[in-house]
Amino acid sequence: MRLLITRPQPDGARTAAALAAHGHEAVLAPLLRIEPVAAAFGRGPWDGAVMTSANAARALATHPRRAEIVALPAFVVGGRTSEAARETGFDHITSADGDADDLVRLIKRQSATALL
């Protein structure tokens, strides 16, 4: 089967490889490009950083305040985001292993109040 993959990179390539492993032909045609910006986060202090996607974790890799941010505990939605957070430099990562609702419940259980 020939399939059109519209995800941005590098996720599109990963999806294409998984499909190829099952005998499908993937055509990569990303519909958007993820462009990190150096957002101003304010002074803090923060109890942790929340990431709902691997793209969010990847964006922090080039942020001017990266060293300060990766020193925080990270609360992430799932496995891919956890992996990206680790690659960005986070050492203390807690994953909800689910969806955004699971992440909210996890954060409430951790009693974190000031989150980035």
Model feature map: region roles:
Residues 1-116:
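Signature of uroporphyrinogen-III synthase
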